[in-house]
C-alpha cells in the first residue's frame, strides 16, 4: 500500500505542521490510567512510554540507548527499494520492524553491528505490551529523542502490521560510501539530497562504537546530548587532528581531540549537491528541528499508507528547550570553516570563548 510521491509529500508537510499538544494532553478519550488522548488506540502507548523511560532509557536519559535507537529506526526503514520491486524482486517492507522480527538475518548485515542487545530489549518490550515491532521502533525513537534537550517532538503513527519479511541486504548506506552512492540509495527510497542532509541531524546526538574501537563512543560533535546545529558547524571545520592512535574505518581527521568525523559526513558537507543545504543547517536550531521532523515523518511511513495509521503523537513527551545559540568552538574562527556553498555566504555565527575543546566519550 503505497501513496504517490506527491500525496505522500503533501501529507508529510501537513503532519509536520500539525504539532501535537503533549503527552496525554490533546484529546477527548480518557485511558484506564487517567491520561487523555485523541484515540483509544493510543492508550496502550502510555504504558509503553513508562516502561521505556524507566527501563530502556534508564530514567529518561539521553545516552547510548537513544543513539542505538536512532540507528535502528533508520536501518529498519531504509530497507525499502522500489527499484528492486520494479525489477521483480522483493524490495523490502520499509518501517515494518523487520530488524526485530528477523534479527537472525538482519543483524548479520555489517551495518547492523553492535545492535543485538538493543534489538532484543525492544523485542521484549513489544511482546510484553502486545504492540507491533514497526510501531515500537518509531515510538521508542520519538520517546528517546524527547530525552535530549532541543529535540523536536516527532510524529508518531500507530497501526503497522507485525507481518514482515527480512529486508534485502545492502540497502543501508554507510560511512564509507561515496556521496553518489548515498544519494542514489536514498533517492531510490524517495528522499531528495536536501532530505538526506535533514535526516543527518540525528548525528547531532551520535557517537561511534565500531568504526574505531580505540576511541569507543567518541561523539560526532561537541554536544552529543543536545540536539543542535553543532554537528553541521563542526563537520565543516578543517580536519587537523587524529583523535585516536590511528584512523579507523571511514574516519577523517577531526577539528579537535575526542571528536570522530565520518567520511560520509565530511563528503556530504562539501559536495556541490548537498553543501548549500548543509550550510543552511548551521545557524538555526529551530530550522534544523523542523526539517528533521518532516524528514522523519516521511521515513516513518515507508512501505505504509499513512492514512491507514492512527495518529498518537499526543503521547510523545516534549523535550526540554535548548536556548544556546550555535557557536564556532573555542580556539577556532570562521577562517577554520571550509565554506563549500558557492551561492550563499556562510552565516554569521559567534565564536565561543576559551581554548580548543577536548571531548570525552559520549555516555
Curated annotation (Swiss-Prot):
The keyword Transmembrane does not apply. PROSITE patterns: PEROXIDASE_1 (PS00435), PEROXIDASE_2 (PS00436), PEROXIDASE_4 (PS50873). Keywords: Calcium, Disulfide bond, Glycoprotein, Heme, Hydrogen peroxide, Iron, Metal-binding, Oxidoreductase, Peroxidase, Pyrrolidone carboxylic acid, Secreted, Signal. GO terms for molecular function: heme binding; lactoperoxidase activity; metal ion binding. Heme b binds at residue 203. It catalyses: 2 a phenolic donor + H2O2 = 2 a phenolic radical donor + 2 H2O. It comes from the Eukaryota. Glycans are attached at residues 162, 358. The modification Pyrrolidone carboxylic acid is found at residue 21. GO terms for cellular component: extracellular region. Ca(2+) 2 binds at residues 204, 221, 223, 226, 228. InterPro entries: Ccp1-like, Haem_peroxidase, Haem_peroxidase_sf, Ligninase, Ligninase_C, Peroxidases_AS, Peroxidases_heam-ligand_BS. Its main location: secreted. The active site is at 75 (proton acceptor). Its EC number is 1.11.1.7. Its cofactor is Ca(2+); heme b. Residues 1-20 form the signal peptide. Binds 2 calcium ions per subunit. It is found in: Secreted. Pfam families: peroxidase (PF00141), Peroxidase_ext (PF11895). Disulfide bonds join 31-43, 42-312, 62-148, 276-341. PANTHER family: CATALASE-PEROXIDASE (PTHR31356:SF66), THYLAKOID LUMENAL 29 KDA PROTEIN, CHLOROPLASTIC-RELATED (PTHR31356). Belongs to the peroxidase family. Ligninase subfamily. This is Peroxidase. It comes from Coprinopsis cinerea. The lineage of its organism: Eukaryota, Fungi, Dikarya, Basidiomycota, Agaricomycotina. The gene is CIP1.
Amino acid at each position: 500500500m503505497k501513496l504517490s510521491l506527491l500525496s505522500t509529500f503533501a501529507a508529510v508537510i501537513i503532519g509536520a505542521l500539525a504539532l501535537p499538544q503533549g503527552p496525554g494532553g490533546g484529546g477527548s478519550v480518557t485511558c484506564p490510567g487517567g491520561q487523555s488522548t485523541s484515540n483509544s488506540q493510543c492508550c496502550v502507548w502510555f504504558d509503553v512510554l513508562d516502561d521505556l523511560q524507566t527501563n530502556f532509557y534508564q530514567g529518561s536519559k539521553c545516552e547510548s540507548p537513544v543513539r542505538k535507537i536512532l540507528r535502528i529506526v533508520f536501518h529498519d526503514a531504509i530497507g525499502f527499494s522500489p527499484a528492486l520491486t520494479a525489477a521483480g524482486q522483493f524490495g523490502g517492507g520499509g518501517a515494518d520492524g523487520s530488524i526485530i522480527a528477523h534479527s537472525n538475518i538482519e543483524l548479520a548485515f555489517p551495518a547492523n553491528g553492535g545492535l543485538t542487545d538493543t534489538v532484543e530489549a525492544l523485542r521484549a518490550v513489544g511482546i510484553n505490551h502486545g504492540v507491533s515491532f514497526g510501531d515500537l521502533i518509531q515510538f521508542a525513537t520519538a520517546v528517546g529523542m524527547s530525552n535530549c534537550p532541543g529535540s523536536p517532538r516527532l510524529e508518531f503513527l500507530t497501526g503497522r502490521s507485525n507481518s514482515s519479511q527480512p529486508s534485502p541486504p545492502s540497502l543501508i548506506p554507510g560511512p564509507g560510501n561515496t556521496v553518489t552512492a548515498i544519494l542514489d540509495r536514498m533517492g531510490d527510497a524517495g528522499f531528495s539530497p536536501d532530505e538526506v542532509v535533514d535526516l543527518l541531524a540525528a548525528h547531532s546526538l551520535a557517537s561511534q562504537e565500531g568504526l574505531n574501537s580505540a576511541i569507543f563512543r567518541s561523539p560526532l560533535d561537541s554536544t552529543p546530548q543536545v540536539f543542535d546545529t553543532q554537528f553541521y558547524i563542526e563537520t565543516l571545520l578543517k580536519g587537523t587532528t587524529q583523535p585516536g592512535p590511528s584512523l579507523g574505518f571511514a574516519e577523517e581527521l577531526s577539528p579537535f581531540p575526542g571528536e570522530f568525523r565520518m567520511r560520509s559526513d565530511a563528503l556530504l558537507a562539501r559536495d556541490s549537491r548537498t553543501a548549500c543545504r548543509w550550510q543552511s543547517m548551521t545557524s538555526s536550531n529551530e530550522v534544523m528541528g523542523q526539517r528533521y521532523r518532516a524528514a522523519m515523518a516521511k521515513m516513518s511511513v515507508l512501505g505504509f499508507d499513512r492514512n491507514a495509521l492512527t495518529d498518537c503523537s499526543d503521547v510523545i513527551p516534549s523535550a526540554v528547550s535548548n536556548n544556546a545559540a550555535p557557536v564556532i568552538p573555542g580556539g577556532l574562527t570562521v577562517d577554520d570553516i571550509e565554506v563549500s556553498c558557492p551561492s550563499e555566504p556562510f552565516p554569521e555565527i559567534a565564536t565561543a570563548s576559551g581554548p580548543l575543546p577536548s571531548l570525552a566519550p559520549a555516555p
